[in-house]
Amino acid sequence: MEKSFYRYLLRFRHGYEEDPVVRFANGAYDDHGFPKGSADYEELSGYLELNGDYLESMVIFDELWEQFLHET
């Protein structure tokens, strides 16, 4: 079974609150519309561009995406 990006992202919750990655993880957790089962870059980035007001910059997502690819 393919691991979703959301499940990967959750490992960063509850960290140092000033960390933008932690804020992203907490925001995605609270976002009921986040595509939780997806491991598709286009779907996730499109969603975040339109709905990810809790994400400071798409660069944060892109960096985490690269880590996700290397770790899964």
UniProtKB/Swiss-Prot annotation:
Matching InterPro entries, A to Z?
Answer: UPF0346, YozE_SAM-like, YozE_SAM-like_sf
One protein family per Pfam:
YozE_SAM_like
Q: Which top-level group of life is the source organism from? A: Bacteria
The UniProt similarity line reads: Belongs to the UPF0346 family.
This protein is called what?
UPF0346 protein GTNG_1419
Q: Which organism is it from?
A: Geobacillus thermodenitrificans (strain NG80-2)
High-level lineage? Bacteria, Bacillati, Bacillota, Bacilli, Bacillales
